[in-house]
Amino acid sequence: MSKVLVLKSSILAGYSQSNQLADHFTTQWQSAHPDDSITVRDLAAQPIPVLDGELVGALRPSDATLTPRQQEALKLSDDLIAELQAHDVIVIAAPMYNFNIPTQLKNYFDLVARAGVTFRYTEQGPEGLVKGKRAIVLTSRGGIHKGTPTDLLEPYLRVFLGFLGLTDLEFVFAEGYGYGPDVAQKATEDAKTQLSQLVTA
């Protein structure tokens, strides 16, 4: 039995294309793997605090007394990392906002990227400590950017997730939603087809 973690990050709730694709994936996965468990974390509905000068002090080893706000941030970071490590399949719904990931997802990344916990530095270089997992990124865009210099999202996510140890990584692109209903419909259909294939892979 596998455990699946689905991370949503769109600010558009039910109107979000990436959220709808994530919901489709969840439904397909439950149908194909009825014994598996699925956890959905909506980073827009349950926002993660922005990492600032005070909070970053909570995430670094120190003997200093933590403020109540730092204590909350450290506990949240510990909980998020434990949740991440406890799952076998990580699904990230990451729409493109202004050529990058949503702030909500970046805030999550900032709390789960911790030296000595999710990665470490060795004589051979950095080593990710989030290992043995499969990761799937669902990314929706108004324009068409895949394979072009304007797609900053895919290379960033490959570097960041790989840095944590998530190297078994697949992308599903749903592009062109700003080009009209016909293009949008085909983008959704193609993405759903690919997702259905990944569910049974």
UniProtKB/Swiss-Prot annotation:
Subunit record text: Homodimer.
Cysteine disulfide links? none
* InterPro entries per record: Flavodoxin_fold (IPR003680), Flavoprotein-like_sf (IPR029039), FMN-dep_NADH:Q_OxRdtase_AzoR1 (IPR050104), NADH:quinone_OxRdtase_FMN_depd (IPR023048)
Where does the source fall among the domains of life? Bacteria
- Reported cofactor(s): FMN
Query: Any idea which UniProt keywords this protein has?
Result: Flavoprotein, FMN, NAD, Oxidoreductase
Give GO MF terms, alphabetically.
electron transfer activity; FMN binding; oxidoreductase activity, acting on NAD(P)H as acceptor; oxidoreductase activity, acting on NAD(P)H, quinone or similar compound as acceptor
What reaction does this enzyme carry out catalytically? 2 a quinone + NADH + H(+) = 2 a 1,4-benzosemiquinone + NAD(+); N,N-dimethyl-1,4-phenylenediamine + anthranilate + 2 NAD(+) = 2-(4-dimethylaminophenyl)diazenylbenzoate + 2 NADH + 2 H(+)
| UniProt feature coiled coil, ranges | none
Cofactor binding remark: Binds 1 FMN per subunit.
Query: So what does this one do?
Result: Quinone reductase that provides resistance to thiol-specific stress caused by electrophilic quinones. Also exhibits azoreductase activity. Catalyzes the reductive cleavage of the azo bond in aromatic azo compounds to the corresponding amines.
Q: What EC number(s) are associated with this protein in UniProt?
A: 1.6.5.-, 1.7.1.17
UniProt similarity note: Belongs to the azoreductase type 1 family.
Q: Name one Pfam family in it.
A: Flavodoxin_2
- The gene it comes from is azoR
Supply the Gene3D superfamilies for this chain: 3.40.50.360
Binding residue positions for FMN: S10, S16, Q17, S18, M96, Y97, N98, F99, S140, R141, G142, G143
Q: Which named protein is this?
A: FMN-dependent NADH:quinone oxidoreductase
Q: Which HAMAP family match?
A: Azoreductase_type1 (MF_01216)
